[in-house]
Amino acid sequence: MAEYNFDLFIIGAGSGGVRAARLASKLGKKVAIAEEYRFGGTCVIRGCVPKKLMVYASSYSKIFKEGQGYGWDQKDAVFSWNKFSKSMNLEIDRLEDIYHDLLTSSNV
């Protein structure tokens, strides 16, 4: 059986876990972090970030309608869930990569 020896073992690679890991590593501690799914935690992967992107995307319909009063002509303002979902997932992937890079550069 493998043996592991860490000064700090963190469960969860969300914002708090990543910050704790980076700070401990900066203090010279040997740190490991475990994550069930993806780096970034609930906020980045399933909660805050996707929700904010959805709310932001939903505001465009009203903006397009209001723009007509200012000379803008948008005839085919059609929402595509597939295009939006792809863009949203690319942004989540980008943020996850940042978390991963922060941990790697901190020797975690």
Give, region by region, the residue ranges found by the protein language model.
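Glycine-rich flavin
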Residues: 3-6, 22-29, 34-108
